Swiss-Prot record:
The gene is rnc. Residues 158-227 form the DRBM domain. HAMAP family: RNase_III. GO terms for biological process: mRNA processing; regulation of gene expression; rRNA processing; tRNA processing. This is Ribonuclease 3. It comes from Oceanobacillus iheyensis (strain DSM 14371 / CIP 107618 / JCM 11309 / KCTC 3954 / HTE831). It comes from the Bacteria.
Length: 228
């Protein structure tokens, strides 16, 4: 396996080339090439899983100083879950660099979510061993962490549902969301939303979409409630 195209694609040069090869080697390939005494990526995936969890935990702790532990746990789980890891790997085109057995390749292994997710974690494990934790953080700062500011994981932080649950504890209260302002050109709008409970403004938030603005308004309301 010539890993130079992979290194060029990633913009990263490995000192220990064998680690990068191993990160992209599936067990099905090893099983079909037993005489070569190759290693699959499962051990690196195990390591990468731990490295990713620590990196995400550190990022959330440092960049969300007012976020409670429970919310950080939910958000971290959304970032490190298989569907998210699969998406990261797809965006980086990891599938085309995988070493798969013929059977796995013929049955769509290059697009299989579990294989892509494992390869992403294995790559992080290899990067950690080759270049250290700081370089893993640099990689995630480019390819993963910016997604947190674009609402990619907003499904994990459904503040509207949390606020609705609170309001339902007081049966007579009515909750309503209003878009009170739209700013910017049509191709780059910013919306300002207000959440109203019992005809009283309870929170305000901004976002690139109406839904994002409403979620942030709900979070603002919840923060006010929790701090009162």
């Amino acid at each position: 396996m010539d890993i130079r195209p992979l290194e060029e694609h990633l913009g990263i040069s490995f000192q220990q080339k064998a680690l990068l090869k191993e990160a992209f080697t599936h067990s099905s390939y090893v099983n079909e090439h037993r005489k070569q005494r190759l290693s699959d990526n499962e051990r690196l995936e195990f390591l990468g899983d731990a490295v990713l969890e620590l990196a995400v935990s550190q990022y959330l702790y440092r960049n969300n100083k007012d976020m409670p532990e429970g919310e950080m746990t939910k958000l971290r789980a959304a970032i490190v879950c298989e569907p998210s890891l699969k998406n990261f790997a797809e965006e980086l085109e990891f599938g085309k660099f995988l070493r798969l057995g013929k059977g796995e390749q013929q049955t769509g292994g290059r697009e299989r979510p579990a294989i892509l997710a494992d390869a992403f974690e294995a790559f992080l494990g290899a990067l950690y061993l080759d270049q250290g934790f700081d370089n893993v953080l640099d990689f995630l700062n480019i390819h993963v962490f910016p997604k947190l500011t674009t609402g990619a994981f907003s499904h994990a932080m459904d503040y509207k549902s949390q606020l609705q649950e609170f309001v339902q504890q007081h049966k007579d209260q009515k909750i309503e969301y209003r878009i009170i302002e739209e700013k910017g050109p049509s191709h780059n709008k910013e919306f300002v939303a207000e959440v109203v409970i019992q005809e009283k403004a309870a929170g305000i938030g901004t976002g690139r979409t109406k839904k994002e603005a409403e979620q942030r308004a709900a979070k603002n309301a919840l923060d006010s409630i929790n701090n009162s």
